[in-house]
Amino acid sequence: MSIFPKISLRLEVENYLKAGFMNEEQFNGLSFPILQHPDLQDVLLIPVIGPRNNIKQQPCEVIVGAQCGNAVLRGAHVYVPGIVSASKFMKGGDVVSVYSDIKGKCKKGAKEFDGTKIFLGNGISELSRKEIFSRLPELKGVGVRMTDPVYLSPSFDNVLPSYLFLQNLPSAVVSHVLDPQPGEKILDLCAAPGGKTTHIAALMHDQGEVIALDKISNKVEKIKQNALLLGLNSIRAFCFDGTKALKLDMVKDTDGEPPFLPESFDRILLDAPCSGLGQRPNMACTWTLKEVTSYQPLQRKLFTVAAELLKPGGVLVYSTCTVTLAENEEQVAWALKTLPHLQLQRQDPQVGGEGMLGAGLSSEQLKRLQRFDPCVVPSQDSDTGSLRDARIEDTMWLANKDCIGFFIAKFVKCKST
């Protein structure tokens, strides 16, 4: 979770969070420790508590889709569009057990479901079954308010939206590795939904220019909304395909709009489209081999464009939220061979582990990479007692490791192309 817009923890922000999320009465006797990351001064950590295995399952059931289930595991309530099925006699105010249909087999509107499902916890239904499946377009709000989830993570819905932005820890690390400076011109080549874009602008103290590209128009609008909400004026977002961002005819610049002339940017973030195998939680593993292997060529196209758009002496950071060798270390090896004007650099801060063997990189090169791999963390339950009693060093070690799968590489362009 990053703090905006200044790179310091405002006392009133920290106190507000502690008052809310350490309120044991509100959270049924539980409290959430709030920790400042020792290496990232603008990041607060709030651990997830669970799994909580003593929750009594109820006869009245609500079935949700896998994506909705993922959101519930991260602290969200159940919104009406995510509800697939509900028990026949469910009324507003009933205590219900919520399950995720991880295989997508439950039919919309079913009155019962005996297929594969994962228990997410209990909540209070806000609406009756009849109201939920009435197909009224205005029914988009909360359908079940989660009161006793298996994984307890506080909801940040409308919590200081002009000060905070929720991120996974590695996503916050990326912008620090890029190290944008006030007055620079920065490109976020694949920017949606804008968490890293806004973080970059905040790190620059909103001084300079941050260009954000994405080829899907509604995602670009989301970037603009986030920038407006956080009071950041240095961001310009465009609906544009990053693979076509390089202007080839060498005519005069187009008033700062894409495509761009070569060597236009001081720093570039390429948070590339990827297979997303590092995302957590994820209860819907629907990828085919064809899909998983389709990203490498696209990433290389974007890599080539980014290298051309970078000024000599400029910094390029490549990142993904996946764990495959092909999309990470192999891409670094390919870039060093194909784009010899790029040099692999050490990273600061170094929060994750080093790179993985198998792509032909030297041990020194692997040490210059950051790989976040939750597989290295032993499975364990967490509760407020264990978190309260743990040493701060152990808690931080766990926070740095027990996160999403992620990869970061940093390059400097040593000469003009």
Ranges and model annotations:
Residues 207-211:
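Short beta-strand element of Class I
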Residues 213-263:
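S-adenosyl-L-methionine
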Residues 105, 195, 276-277, 325:
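Short glycine-rich, flexible loops that bind phosphorylated cofactors or substrates
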Residues 182, 206, 231-234, 264, ...:
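Short loop/turn motifs at secondary-structure junctions
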Residues 16, 151-158, 162, 245-275, ...:
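C-terminal catalytic and target-recognition region of SAM-dependent MTase-like enzymes
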Residues 99, 187-189, 213, 238, ...:
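The conserved SAM/SAH-binding core of class I Rossmann-like methyltransferase domains
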Residues 1-194, 198-203, 217, 221, ...:
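Glycine-rich nucleotide cofactor-binding entry segment
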